Amino acid sequence: MRVADFTFELPDSLIARHPLAERRGSRLLTLDGPTGALAHRQFTDLLEHLRPGDLMVFNNTRVIPARLFGQKASGGKLEILVERVLDSHRVLAHVRSSKSPKPGSKILIDGGGEAEMLARHDTLFELGFAEEVLPLLDRVGHMPLPPYIDRPDEGADRERYQTVYAQRLGAVAAPTAGLHFDQPLLEAIAAKGVETAFVTLHVGAGTFQPVRVERIEDHHMHHEWLEVGQDVVDAVAACRARGGRVVAVGTTSVRSLESAARDGVLKPFSGDTDIFIYPGRPFHVVDALVTNFHLPESTLLMLVSAFAGYPETMAAYRAAVENGYRFFSYGDAMFITRNPAPTAPKDLAPEETV
């Protein structure tokens, strides 16, 4: 399967660089999996597509202000993007500078603070901080807006690039499908008889990395930490018993649930995942999906294509562009029910469709 099969033309004007005034103000493109039918709605119309007895699964990770600016002791400027907090004083980070810092070198953080380069692990740098990392990031860190939001972060991003139900610190990118939900909408969902459950997947900066191979099968996913608790397993079982659907809010919730059910049975799981879902891969847990619009040739677009079917997904994206939907993290959303017989690009080998 070719990565190029997942490209589409996107006018720059459709990239959402700022959030709307209200979280729930986005548009919603619905895609019916069994028929491929599309409908243009508002995000608050999501309520009409949910049924009593359904279970919505959210990712409760919390974005940390993971971007730091500073300079080396030699005076050279650099930028740090924390990828993972290892403990109270150490992180793994991407470092951008004219020359990479060497082990033992000191880094002075803008706004106050100091770090030491401890070791290099492939493309990541292990950094040690004199003070505790999370309070330091909260004090002088910047929200790690995605590269396609090509502007400096603003004070408002600390609130809006965060879900209202975010709890567990550790993400360096938001689970963006959740950004559309405000507290009144969550209350309305509960009032309809829809249950909720929460997984945790700390989204890493690797989510924005382009696929650099020509064929999908040659791509290796980055690792991210996740946790699916026994409470989620029990909630899914109860949902199945009452005939409800499991509705994942965001691709990170999908990847969490499907990682915990790789052998076909959902079990509690805590640890790293590198699951790569693309056309031909089965889904064991998720029946419906709320998701934003994703980048061309991205692994997230491939996941949606696996869920809804390749031709149906690409047709939906063409319709979204034609109708002026806003794309990416601060953009509009889709509600998709799973296609029971999804098809893939034409050159998918038969053995890969099972």
Swiss-Prot record:
Keywords for this protein: Cytoplasm, Queuosine biosynthesis, S-adenosyl-L-methionine, Transferase
The keyword Amino-acid biosynthesis is assigned to this record: no
Any single Gene Ontology cellular-component annotation: cytoplasm
SUPFAM superfamilies (alphabetical): QueA-like (SSF111337)
Subcellular location: Cytoplasm
Enzyme Commission code(s) on record: 2.4.99.17
Gene Ontology MF: a single term: S-adenosylmethionine:tRNA ribosyltransferase-isomerase activity
One GO BP annotation of this record: queuosine biosynthetic process
Matches recorded under Pfam families: Queuosine_synth (PF02547)
Catalytic activity: 7-aminomethyl-7-carbaguanosine(34) in tRNA + S-adenosyl-L-methionine = epoxyqueuosine(34) in tRNA + adenine + L-methionine + 2 H(+)
Biochemical pathway: tRNA modification; tRNA-queuosine biosynthesis
Free-text function comment from the UniProt entry: Transfers and isomerizes the ribose moiety from AdoMet to the 7-aminomethyl group of 7-deazaguanine (preQ1-tRNA) to give epoxyqueuosine (oQ-tRNA).
Assembly and binders: Monomer.
Family note: Belongs to the QueA family.
Protein name: S-adenosylmethionine:tRNA ribosyltransferase-isomerase
Biological source species: Pseudomonas fluorescens (strain ATCC BAA-477 / NRRL B-23932 / Pf-5)
Gene: queA
